């Protein structure tokens, strides 16, 4: 039996389809971050992008997301090293660091239910951007 692609290929060797499938759909990338103007320190909030369906943790308009959210970040093989803020559970980060996918990952389990059960997804903490008045009141630790 052959090994899964993520165990035999580097991130650079993966097809676009394989690359996209690494995303566990936790929604952590879709939580807004605030940056301190003086220190450049990044603060994580529980404020979800307007395009995030909090229940499913999926973008409502993934293919056209940049039209709706010009500041949305596109994670690629080329800019991955610049995203040190990615959660420690992120498959892209784990593989970039030479670590295995975590046991609950949808590619291993076959569904996202284990990820939600482990409370990795933002479904239990996210609030809608439209409902937020003071973003500073929604600062959390790294998700």
Curated annotation (Swiss-Prot):
InterPro entries per UniProt:
Puta_zinc/iron-chelating_dom (IPR005358), UCP006173 (IPR008228)
Any single Pfam family the record assigns to this protein: CxxCxxCC
Q: Which family does it belong to?
A: Belongs to the UPF0260 family.
What this protein is called in its record is UPF0260 protein plu2141
**UniProt organism field:** Photorhabdus laumondii subsp. laumondii (strain DSM 15139 / CIP 105565 / TT01)
């Amino acid at each position: 039996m052959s090994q899964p692609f993520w165990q035999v290929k580097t991130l650079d060797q993966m097809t676009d389809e394989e690359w996209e499938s690494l995303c566990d759909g936790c929604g952590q990338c879709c939580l807004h971050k605030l940056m301190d103007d003086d220190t450049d320190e990044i603060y994580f909030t529980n404020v979800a992008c307007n395009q995030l369906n909090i229940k499913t943790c999926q973008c409502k308009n993934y293919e056209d997301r940049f039209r709706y959210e010009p500041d949305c970040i596109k994670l690629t093989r080329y800019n991955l090293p610049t995203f040190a803020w990615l959660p420690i559970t992120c498959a892209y980060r784990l593989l970039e660091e030479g670590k295995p996918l975590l046991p609950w990952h949808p590619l291993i389990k076959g569904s996202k239910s284990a990820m939600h059960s482990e409370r990795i997804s933002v479904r239990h903490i996210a609030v809608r951007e439209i409902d937020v008045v003071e973003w500073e009141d929604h600062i959390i630790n790294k998700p």
